[in-house]
Design a protein with these regions (language model features):
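Extended charged/polar low-complexity repeat regions
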Residues: 46, 52-948
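Intrinsically disordered, low-complexity segments enriched in small residues
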Residues: 1-60, 118-120
């Protein structure tokens, strides 16, 4: 009995699936929320729960239903207490000899008797403290009166003289009114904004309909035992039909699209068959705890539990993860398959006080007496501090640099904040605490509108542009209309999958799904299709299209993509570690790339097919601290307390430094020469000026929507721009006053450009928004054609000259047909590298590559050839022609060319400044040419010296 009660609702250690069913017990369990809003203690909701195995319970919402504030305590004959929870489950607390109570194993509750005064009399009630330190207060009759969270925020339940619930008052004072019928059923819920939810029941006390504030209705049907047999959504579609066996377990579910899943129960197992026929077997012990799962692909998941009824280990194809817990049931350690362990500590309020990652780095947290977090300290010792008002709302946050952001509130709603730069943002809300307006520091206002159910129906931008949405009964967007009146429409199947979308020009894309609602076909406006196939685990195994052919995907037992075969039949094979990190990838020509990682999964080294490698190191906060490139050059990085990059240094001693304002906008960049570029911003964070190393300043201005409207350079030359309400650039005036104007179609494609002289270029697009035609007043008409992948297959210029293009399955251009009819042919290797090119005159050039993709040999049918060698960074070291003549190249560790030795022995050498600019070139005859630059990098002089 005790086990059965605990298994209602979200049964501990049970599996759930389909619409949904507790796969360990066969219980049909469903949650539906009738109202939600932001509150001082988080999200407040009125949520109903249904249990098909709980129809003997007759609650405020009828048989089998419960809701999150319909909780109670009942004293049993032996003194134990039965706790009815809001999800329909119940737990029994044993009473000890000292009068205390003990919660069932695996549940973190503290239940104690308390005395209270009511109408001048002393009574004994109870307080139940949960894992979040929220206290549920019950009166002498076991009726729930208050819920007080860890910060003291109280939700109050009021009852009439007959103990019928009459209202619920949230911590901020919002009231949800409750009306009950003569049977004690809730018949109406009144919302703070005046909206109403109404409920109807049949003669047996079953809830048969719920009508939301929009006036749309859900409907429910039951069998003679009050087990729900079906329910309809607000669109009138029957979302699910349930069939039960004699023991009240769901044995079949049929959804709105006629997909059918079945459930077969054994002595200690359940076998499910999904809509596509895939079978999964769930095994459980005598407490209905899942012990193993056999998946359709033959892999398994095994679970074990400790003596306190907590999950102790979980073993999948990827390996085993184990858990330990503290005395209050909090996870204390997690140990991975690779032996690495993460650990956690908590305070007496079960608040996390430290988290030590798999790399050994620790983040710590501290709290005030009310449980508010007052500091969080990163592994490097940097701390963020927080302060709170008397309602436990965070009123300031100070980062590691000492920069403070402050916040103001009205009840639970943040009405404004002032950032570290002193810029103020403001917000307003409706009666349901939904954000209605946002005002930026410049005074620009954006706003939202909602329907009675709280669905967003329109957004108004700061420039007045309105985007509007139309929704169906369940909240799917069926149409969106932009600020210029262009409308896109959408359709859905009965299970809420999008089946089509039609753009403002009438072009339609469509989608088809299998019985498990996996997309199996997508068709664009031209009728081009992509089809998909899936394995029994729901992973894509095949993707097909007439132009790219068929792509294949294979997975290892852990679900990692181990083999990918492209449309040309070329395969890439990968290997993974127990954490799912790729260790090695072998491409279709045999090149192998290897990867290494640190304990947090950051990539620490890549070794390429030619043996070169690039490595990275990270600090204990997970930030890139050092990298060594293929030539051994080392770059180090440092950060400020807000994680902004403040310096970058290489091993030659060069350093770049950066500064930031209090909100993270970059204020300056200083290069190794000492040259500094500075930036300024408006209060909204838009860049308004940049001053280069020479002191030259460019300025910028923006419209209310944040679009750049003017750009003025250091010489005073100004470019101005205007935009439509969709943010499309509609005119641009250059520094000479010449204005170009642009127009657009409903999809946002530019349809015309008119220059200052009145010359117009018109553009036309096909149904998939590819440029189809340009008409230039001076150059005439050019047309374009495309394949299903958007590759250009034909271009005909204004003179009628047509160029045709052919591609292989991977989009490599294999031939070009010239207007003369001549062809240029290209061939590629298995990884898309060009290996052969034949031009219209019959010249054939072949190419070969090394493991890093560098060209190492090219030769033509005229006897010409060239061979190349490279360093690890891909710089050419030698170049040898068909006669054996070799040119050699020498570089420094930063990849800068120092010396070029020609085949005849002549040498050209190069010198550089600290900014990698060439400062001198000495040719083979000893002539030296020097160069100077300004601070920005513009060349100031070139001096040719006499022979040294």
């Amino acid at each position: 009995m005790r086990i059965d009660g605990a298994l209602m609702g979200r049964g501990l250690h049970c599996e759930f699936g389909f619409e949904p069913v507790n796969l360990n017990t066969g219980n049909f369990y469903m949650d539906q929320s009738d109202a939600t809003m932001n509150e001082l203690n988080g999200e407040f909701s009125i949520t109903r729960s249904y249990n098909s195995k709980g129809t003997d319970q007759h609650s405020m919402f009828g048989r089998g239903w419960s809701f999150n504030y319909d909780q109670s305590l009942s004293q049993m004959e032996d003194g134990s207490l039965l706790y009815m929870r809001g999800d329909g489950s119940y737990l029994i607390f044993d009473k000890n000899e000292d009068g205390s109570y003990t919660a069932p194993d695996g549940y973190v509750y503290d239940l104690k008797a308390v005395s209270y005064k009511d109408t001048d009399h002393d009574y004994i009630g109870w307080e139940l403290t949960d894992a979040d330190q929220s206290v549920w207060s019950f009166d002498k009759y076991g009726i729930l009166r208050y819920v007080t969270d860890v910060n003291g925020f109280k939700t109050v339940l009021d009852y009439d003289d007959d103990y019928n619930l009459s209202k619920i008052t949230t911590p901020s004072g919002k009231t949800f009114g409750v009306k009950q019928d003569k049977f004690g059923h809730i018949k109406e819920l009144s919302l703070p904004d005046g909206g109403k939810v109404s409920y109807k029941y049949d003669e047996q006390g079953n809830l048969i309909s719920v009508t939301d504030p929009n006036g749309t209705t859900k409907e429910y049907k039951y069998d003679d035992d009050s087990r729900m047999t079906s329910w309809k959504d607000e669109n009138g579609n029957t979302v699910v039909k349930n069939t039960y066996d004699k023991e009240g377990r769901v044995v079949e579910q049929t959804d709105a699209e006629k997909g059918t899943a079945t459930f077969k129960y054994g002595k200690s197992s359940t076998t499910t068959t999904d809509n596509e026929g895939n079978k999964t077997v769930y095994h459980y012990d005598d407490q209905y705890r899942t012990t193993s799962i056999e998946y359709p692909d033959g892999t398994t998941c095994e679970k074990t539990y400790n003596a306190e009824n907590q999950l102790a280990s979980e073993t999948t194809a990827a390996g085993t993860k184990t858990y330990t817990y503290d005395t209050f049931g909090n996870v204390a350690t997690e140990t991975r398959e690779d032996g690495k362990t993460a650990s956690y500590t908590y305070n007496e309020q079960n608040k996390l006080t430290s988290a030590t990652g798999y790399n050994g780095a620790t983040v710590t947290y501290s709290y005030d007496g009310n449980g508010n977090m007052v500091t969080s300290t990163k592994p490097d010792g940097t701390a963020i501090t927080y302060t709170y008002d008397d309602k436990h709302r965070m009123v300031s946050q100070t980062d590691g640099r000492g920069v403070t952001t402050t916040y103001s509130y009205d009840g639970p709603n943040m009405t404004g904040y002032v950032d570290g730069n002193g810029a103020a943002w403001g917000f307003t809300y409706d009666a349901m605490n939904r954000a209605v307006t946002m005002t930026d520091p410049l005074g620009n206002v954006t706003s939202n509108s909602y329907d009675a159910n709280g669905n967003l129906t329109s957004k108004t931008a700061a420039d007045g542009g309105v985007t509007a949405y139309t929704l169906d009964g369940v909240g799917n967007i069926t149409a969106s209309t932009d600020a210029l009146g262009n409308t896109t429409t959408y359709t859905y199947d009965k299970m809420y999958n999008m089946t089509s979308g039609t753009d403002p020009k009438g072009n339609q894309i469509s989608y088809v799904y299998d019985k498990n609602y996996q997309q199996v076909k997508a068709t664009d406006a031209k009728g081009n299709t992509i089809t998909y196939k899936y394995d029994s685990m729901g992973r894509v195994i095949e993707e097909s299209n007439k132009d790219f052919g068929t792509k294949l995907y294979e997975y290892d037992k852990a679900g990692n993509l181990k083999k990918y075969t492209d449309g040309n039949g070329n395969a890439t094979v990968s290997k993974f570690d127990s954490l799912g990190q790729v260790l090695q990838s072998k491409d279709a020509v045999g090149n192998i790339t290897k990867y290494e990682y640190d304990a947090l999964g950051n990539e620490t080294k890549i070794t390429y097919g030619d043996g070169s490698s690039h490595s990275k190191e990270y600090d204990n906060c997970g930030r890139l601290a050092k990298e060594t490139d293929e030539l051994g050059a080392v770059t180090t990085y440092t950060y400020d307390a807000a994680d902004n990059l403040v310096s970058k240094s290489d091993d030659s001693g060069r350093t770049w430094t950066y500064t930031y304002d209090n909100t993270g906008n970059r204020l300056s960049e200083t290069n190794p020469e000492g040259g500094t570029t500075t930036y300024t911003y408006d209060k909204a964070g838009n860049l308004v000026s940049s001053t280069d190393e020479e002191g030259r300043t460019d300025t910028y201005a923006y419209d209310k929507a944040g679009n750049l409207t003017t750009s003025k350079d250091a010489l005073g030359y100004t470019v101005s721009m205007k935009y439509d309400l969709n943010g499309n650039l509609v005119s641009s005036t250059d520094e000479n006053g010449n204005t170009s104007t642009m127009t657009y179609d409903g999809n946002g494609n530019m349809t015309s450009v008119s220059d200052a002289k009145g010359n117009i270029t018109a553009m036309k697009y096909d149904s998939t928004d590819n440029l189809e035609q340009t008409v230039d007043a001076l150059k005439g008409k050019t047309t374009y054609e495309y394949d299903s992948q958007g590759n250009s297959t034909k271009m005909t210029d204004a003179l009628g000259n047509a160029y045709s293009y052919v591609y292989d399955k991977e989009g490599n251009n294999t031939s070009i047909i010239l207007p003369t009819g001549d062809k240029v042919l290209m061939e590629y290797d298995a990884i898309g590298q060009l290996v052969k090119c034949t031009d219209a005159q019959g010249l054939v050039i072949t190419y070969q590559y090394d493991g890093a993709g560098n060209l190492i040999h090219s030769s033509d049918n005229g006897g010409n050839s060239m061979d190349y060698t490279y360093d690890g960074a891909g710089n050419v070291l030698t170049q040898t022609d068909e006669l054996g003549r070799t040119a050699t190249y020498k570089y420094d560790q930063y990849g800068r060319l120092l010396k070029l030795t020609e085949a005849d022995g002549s040498i050209t050498s190069y010198e550089y400044d600290v900014m990698d600019r060439i400062t001198a070139v000495t040719d083979a005859e000893g002539h030296k040419t020097t160069f100077t630059y300004d601070k920005v990098g513009n060349q100031l002089s070139m001096t040719e010296e006499e022979e040294a």
